[in-house]
Swiss-Prot record:
Xref: Pfam families: Ub-RnfH (PF03658)
Gene: rnfH
Assigned protein family: Belongs to the UPF0125 (RnfH) family.
Identification of the protein by name: Protein RnfH
Stored SUPFAM superfamilies: MoaD/ThiS
InterPro entries with a match to the protein in the record: Mopterin_synth/thiamin_S_b, RnfH, RnfH_sf
TM ranges: none
Amino acid sequence: MDNPNIAIEVVYALADRQKLLRLSVPVGTTVREAALRSGMQQFFPELDLHHAPLGIFGKAVAKPEERVLEEGERVEIYRPLIADPKEVRKQRAAKAKTREEGEEPA
């Protein structure tokens, strides 16, 4: 008997555009294999699918080379963080404090 396939999706998004691809892959395909099979690099040549962080339905997958996909799952290709989230929060808090200090009662 042939090895059956499962239907999955692979997605990648930038601030200004995104792409969702529907694939049929063999049972036993890992998260990393699905990303590599997707052909997403056709649309985003800068992507390094061999090393990009990956997730399923908004949750990062620690070992995408080992995690086997199930029917209907959506593989998400994550972009690297541009700024450290802690630093961004500090900057936002400092800005808010400066604004508050500037608003003196009349």
